[in-house]
Amino acid sequence: MTDTNKLKDFRHRSSVYDSMVKSPNRAMLRATGMTDDSFEKPIVGVISTWAENTPCNIHLHDFGKLAKEGVKEAGAWPVQYGTITVADGIAMGTPGMRFSLTSRDIIADSIEAAMGGHNVDAFVAIGGCDKNMPGSMIAIANMDIPAVFAYGGTIAPGNLNGKDIDLVSVFEGIGKWNNGDLTAEEVRQIECNACPGPGGCGGMYTANTMATAIEVMGMSIPGSSSHPAESPEKKADIEEAGRAVVRMLELGIKPSDIMTREAFEDAITVTMALGGSTNATLHLLAIAHAANVDLTLEDFNDFQERVPHLADLKPSGKYVFQDLYNVGGVPAVMKYLLKNGFLHGDRITCTGKTVAENLKNFADLTPGQDVIMPLENPKRADGPLIILKGNLAPEGAVAKVSGVKVRNHTGPAKVFDSEEEAIEAVLTDEIVDGDVVVVRYVGPKGGPGMPEMLSLSSMIVGKGQGDKVALLTDGRFSGGTYGLVVGHIAPEAQDGGPIAYLRTGDLVTVDQDTKEITMHVSDQEIEERKKTTVIPPLYSRGVLGKYAHTVSSASKGAVTDFWRPERTGKK
């Protein structure tokens, strides 16, 4: 335990309650259990996205209690808070999906409001589902007080007939059922066995991608991103997060010391090597924006060209994230990449040690394992996340090409203004091999909320068309998506981007070799179409209306604040 008398000097924010005139404030705090002794200690917030509606988050309230124990053991005063979550897998394919990305910024704002409003000296943020991680990190960057992120852990794989399955197995089962390859009862068996307990979705999907990126950056406990939700190691790392944040206070380490340009470079490197989610581009841009780090969409292509894809992880591979844990986890991957010159080993982390110092305590990848391929024989010679540009996406678009055999595709567009219309077309066999399915007006402003298209993409894969039909959108894709898919097309249709003027029958080319996305329509014809195209009014009611009117382009991370360093300064 840290010397409490020494910790009194680190009450940089909670000391506002010390003076005589703050007696009323202290009266309220005494009602929560604080005493004269407590007021001598730093106040550390512990805020989680606990909720009972999803396996990703159902265990996080108990994890908050563990983090509090770590804070207490380190000599500070912990206070637990709660904020919201939106479960992507439950919202998917419904109107609720518009609230998913929106929730990222609500989480960020609510954490900042709770921690700032109560003058905490430091905090631990605990998250489990996709938007929890970037939402927490945006708040951490904006607050810039000692903070640690703690991940709720990955779910164990389900099992059916001796085979590992997961949530994406159910989504793809719908396509197979529609194609006549599975019966309704067989799909029900997959449904009933896919999710056996608590934890984030089990492949290299968005939750595990972002948890990994945060660990690589140095903002969570080493090894924690790959600890399964129900493992003893996970409980230990949650408690350690409480101790670590107090240590950050003592050492004077702030998130801005950790979240440097080099930290983001390493996060992108490991994301490429592991075959992470397309959502990593959106979220890392948003976190970098909050951290005042210069990061652009084009930077991702720089790393894509020099970092090979090594991991045989779902959605395009064989293994789930727990299998990576079994062969050494994220630290073993980092050790391998560091040894081969891909990472910055001298960066400081939330432990007070450098990346290289942290990794000394971990074993190498298990000899003979085949979850992570060697650099000499990678899954793919370059990274699987590609930024495309062209006259259909002048600001850029994001493609994930892991497991995709087709390197370029040209076909006629079939254009839909909603996912529901596109799903109906797939279910009624209107989509044929060679088509380019386009879903627009579902971007950050147009959705509003930039919904994911996992229901649609999984149906296409389930029907055996994953390599034969391209799917394009100004919306997003789940980390569980694979196939010939391109998302985040910017500018979006709602902003008058070229995708708004695409018509059914127009030829579209997606080329991963040239990194181009082209609509074969002349500039003159596009200008003519602009004269007759009516952009629908921007949604304006409630939280989605606020979001639609403030959110930036996906090419800038879909951020919702007005902070610009050249205009406002940042204190």
Curated annotation (Swiss-Prot):
List of residues binding Mg(2+) = D88, D130, K131, E452
Q: What chemistry does it catalyse, as a reaction equation?
A: (2R)-2,3-dihydroxy-3-methylbutanoate = 3-methyl-2-oxobutanoate + H2O; (2R,3R)-2,3-dihydroxy-3-methylpentanoate = (S)-3-methyl-2-oxopentanoate + H2O
- Name the coenzymes or cofactors required: [2Fe-2S] cluster; Mg(2+)
GO biological-process terms attached to the record? isoleucine biosynthetic process; L-valine biosynthetic process
According to its UniProt record, the EC number is 4.2.1.9
Stored InterPro entries? DHAD_IlvD/Edd, Dihydro-acid_dehy_C, DihydroxyA_deHydtase, DiOHA_6PGluconate_deHydtase_CS, ILV_EDD_C, ILV_EDD_N, IlvD/EDD_N
**Modified residues annotated as N6-carboxylysine in this record:** K131
Locate the active site: S478
| Record's subunit section | Homodimer.
The Swiss-Prot or TrEMBL record describes its family as follows: Belongs to the IlvD/Edd family.
Q: Could you tell me what this protein is called?
A: Dihydroxy-acid dehydratase
Write down the species.
Streptococcus suis (strain 05ZYH33)
